[in-house]
Amino acid sequence: MKMKYIYRRWLFLMAGALLVANFASCNDNDENSPILPPTYSVDRSNMFGIHEQPKVGENIGGQSDNGVTPQLVADMCGALGVKSFRMLLHLSWVFDHDAEGNLIFKEDNLQKFKDYAALLTEKGVRNIMLTNAAYMYPYGCTRSHWKAVPEPGTELYIKFMQQIEDSYKMLAAAFPDVTQFEVGNELNAPKGHNLCKDGFRDGATAEENAPFIFTTSEQALVTADICYYANRGVKAANPKAKVVAPGLYMVDIPETKAYLSAIYDHIVSVSYTHLRAHETDQYL
């Protein structure tokens, strides 16, 4: 306790000394001194656009501000000189099933996103990454929540993963100029925030949802499988495109390191055989 007190007092004194030194350096002669801008440089080729999802179509984006449109976002990117851009495009926004259960595009929605990408390209964006966080569920099957994933190792789980492969094959073919596909978002988030088992429900208590929360190891397993199958689909349509691992949830979550280690272990482990052959370059 005494050491903490001394440390806090030392910080306070140092901050005070810096303030005094700063004020002491100002005198009457400084009034006519030129105010110079800070010296820094910006490599615009490294600028990366990320934004509030604009209102692309009915029930797509604009949740926070209906005034944010694709044109406005593109104009701002052009003004800033942004060259790379992360575009949110959930698979559920552009895919559906026909009466026979085949995966098909929602053509109107797909065209809206193509137009959005064209606006960005017109304003100078050269690298577009499509980001998804809402996967389609196999035809004829229901689930308790849009973010629910079937239990690993089940037949439904295999169908789910194969549909991810089919989805990304179609998506990569529909966007031949897209260079990167981020195949999930914060799948390691706690409490089933972005990934859960069927049975998880909004409004349920933590105790009621507890059986439907993936462990860190299970989150890593599902993430590795998603990357594997999405990569197969993307590469089938566009061998030059890249699959990007889902962005990490890193707020007050010490399990992040274990999650990343488990993904690596799942990829390189020779005992990881519940799906297909797993060469490490077939993931990302």
Language model segments and positions:
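Boundary/entry segment of secreted carbohydrate-active catalytic domains
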Residues: 34-83, 88
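Distinct, well-ordered alpha-helical segments
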Residues: 252-271
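Bacterial Sec-dependent N-terminal signal peptides
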Residues: 21-40
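Bacterial N-terminal signal peptides that target proteins for export
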Residues: 2-12
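Substrate-binding cleft and catalytic face of glycoside hydrolase catalytic domains
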Residues: 80-99, 111-254
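Bacterial N-terminal signal peptides
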Residues: 13-22
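Conserved small/polar residues in nucleotide/adenosyl-binding loops
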Residues: 273-280
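Short, acidic/polar
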Residues: 63-77, 163-170, 260-263
